[in-house]
Amino acid sequence: MKDNNEVLKLFIVSDSIGETAQRMIHATLTQFPDLTQVEIKKFPYIKDEQEFLNVLQLAKEQNAIVATTLVSESFNALGHQFANEHQIPYVDYMSELISIIKQHTHAKPLMESGALRKLNDEYFKRIEAIEYSVKYDDGKHFTDIGEADALIVGVSRTSKTPLSMYLANKGYKIANIPLVPEVAIPDNVFQQKNLKVFGLTASPNYIANIRRNRAETLGLSSESNYNSLERIKKELSYAEEVFRKLNATVINTEYKSIEESAFYIEKFLAKR
């Protein structure tokens, strides 16, 4: 190119969507604010060598720069060979770095197309699960509870919220409902036939100690109806009734870590 008024043509060639090369190109172009005439063409899902050669030939005819994110070693070799023979400006974002990392670590690369997109899909699935679990935490919502991968129920201080958030970070949509004898559970919860339900429980003394510690931390009286053994036994009795009605798998969380309880739940969810 002789001046900034000429059109800079860039071809993105990928065996997947081509997002990686596109981001790199856009990041690079920010270093050239005076280049106002830029034309970017994307050629995604290139799986055939002849198709690849056709793109390279077009790049030669249009004096375009070619940027690739191709995992296939044979495709990369073909691209480099054609570019060298025909003096095409050619940038290979993938193979050289893969080779360097492989040599440096002796690790074996996946050599899988679209691995970043799959990683992004997993990331957004996790974000969606976290957003759902926050919305359906502590019985705040019931409308779309059937979308949950699991429902966790239990009396106060049985680790419902920490367990829900831990599982949400693993991509599971979790709803949780606190069980209080004076607060009825909506009928639509009982109508969910395919919803996997887990009931959390512990001994009255264990729960009482946790509640007293919680009250002291908040600067409240450690002696109240909320902390009394009689009240807690009443709540646990009510919880057992709810567990039966919901056909819940019961988990005793006493002295268990969140990871232990989550592992147990994940085993059940994996069977679905």
From Swiss-Prot:
Domain of life: Bacteria
Binding locations of ADP: G154, V155, S156, R157, T158, S159, K160, T161
A single GO molecular function term of this UniProt record: ADP binding
Keyword Nucleotide-binding: yes
Pfam families: Kinase-PPPase
Keywords, comma-separated and alphabetical: Kinase, Nucleotide-binding, Serine/threonine-protein kinase, Transferase
InterPro entries registered for this protein in UniProt: Kinase-pyrophosphorylase, PPDK_reg
Reaction catalysis annotation: N(tele)-phospho-L-histidyl/L-threonyl-[pyruvate, phosphate dikinase] + ADP = N(tele)-phospho-L-histidyl/O-phospho-L-threonyl-[pyruvate, phosphate dikinase] + AMP + H(+); N(tele)-phospho-L-histidyl/O-phospho-L-threonyl-[pyruvate, phosphate dikinase] + phosphate + H(+) = N(tele)-phospho-L-histidyl/L-threonyl-[pyruvate, phosphate dikinase] + diphosphate
Transferase is among the record's keywords: yes
Enzyme Commission identifier(s): 2.7.11.32, 2.7.4.27
Family label: Belongs to the pyruvate, phosphate/water dikinase regulatory protein family. PDRP subfamily.
Designated name of the protein: Putative pyruvate, phosphate dikinase regulatory protein 2
